């Protein structure tokens, strides 16, 4: 019986425990401190969130202690901050002190403790929102209308003493808009907002934040209605500007229609014409540069020609045959009407020396004293001395050459083909003569040649007849040019040229007066082996004389003359007392025919004396 009673008691106890477990009673859950806030950095409040109560009434207690202390304190005020909060008054708040705070939950089934929270009052400041938010639309006279926003700092914050420094932020939007427009105002408590839409109702809010802390909540919304005539004045101004611009445009169109030409002339003045006297604008437009330059008195462009035809187109013909018909000894036996030729260092005709810088440099370096000259006497008189009457027998070929070729005196330096003016001569005859004068010259020279070939002896009568022929030549050239002297400048060491002596034959005369020449190789039995084809010259050439059968003898000017060769040849063949001056010159030059042709870096000219040996 006693055993049954004991088992019954155990069963009832187990049943009671199961009933209590089925009702959910347990120890409380762990609470959580989620926020601590100080509105003015003098007091602060902490809030927690409780855990599960276990089906039983639960008691919550907040305890704290300061860092470095062991004494634990309980919350001084559970009511000021609201439920589940603890308020710390100024008495219990310290700056620059760290608080270690915990929350304890206790019921009949047990207790639990929250995680500790470390709080520094300086960094948990969250002020209240600003107060007395005011909105106003202002219309200044000199500027556009704008929205004027004003507010006051929170009441609890001591801003005047500088205990806290607040910064403000404003946001606004139209009433029906979804997004806010935010403006940062800084530390000022007023702000201007521009560019508002007329007729709209705007909502405005403001908030603040300390230097170290959090933004406050937004203040309550404030609204304002923007009037419809907010931009009417601007529209009126634009309408006025448009009307005024239209009137100005109409006035300008009317003025242009009445005085269009005058206004165009005033805005775009015409280009002034040329002020030069005698200037023809038509020549400038047509592009005729020759006529335009001649109008200014300028020289025309030099003639252009193919370099292959320079020998024919720019052949220089010298028809002063009278000078070359007279032998060199006429200098010693000149008549009373003969005037001595003045010495001139150079008289460049402009044809040869322009293309020969070496000749010009040589002439500048050579001394110019005592040059030898050729003379052309006007009258040939009979010599008074008996030895001048001695007769000599010459062959016809020698007579022809004596009458046609000028000779160098033995004591002269070197022959030159540069013409010089006589003392009484003031104008220079052009080297390019008329075709009629050239024909007259060729006829007269041909006649002289034939008369010279018919004579067999040289006598006094022959000398007089020769003078008569010379006068005929002078009369044929009286219209063309005056007598020209030939200067013999001093020489420099020569360069012996291996080129053979050449002749040219007149092929035809074109309408411009230019001579077409055919090169003709010299025909001499003893010089045939040395003759060669003449090189094509791209320089100017000078004609020494015109022989029979229309053959021109080309004269080329050597760069220098070897005086030593001439003197040596003179010593080897000394002249006899009965010889005249012409025979002396002939004997001195006939000893060195191969050395007569010299060459220099400029133009290649031939000395007339060199033909004496080649024509035998």
UniProtKB/Swiss-Prot annotation:
Secretion signal span: 1-24
Coiled coil: none
Topological domain spans for side Extracellular: 25-234
Predominant subcellular localization, coarse grouping: membrane
Localization, UniProt: Membrane
Biased composition (Basic and acidic residues): 463-482
Motif (Box 1 motif): 267-275
Membrane topology of this protein: Single-pass type I membrane protein
Occurrences of domain Fibronectin type-III (ranges): 27-128, 129-229
Residues given in the record as Zn(2+) binding sites: 211-212
SMART domains in the cross-refs: FN3
Keywords: Disulfide bond, Glycoprotein, Membrane, Metal-binding, Receptor, Repeat, Signal, Transmembrane, Transmembrane helix, Zinc
TM region(s), chain numbering: 235-258
Motif (WSXWS motif): 215-219
GO molecular function: cytokine binding; metal ion binding; peptide hormone binding; prolactin receptor activity
Domain notes: The WSXWS motif appears to be necessary for proper protein folding and thereby efficient intracellular transport and cell-surface receptor binding.
Purpose: This is a receptor for the anterior pituitary hormone prolactin.
Annotated protein name in UniProt: Prolactin receptor
Lineage: Eukaryota, Metazoa, Chordata, Craniata, Vertebrata
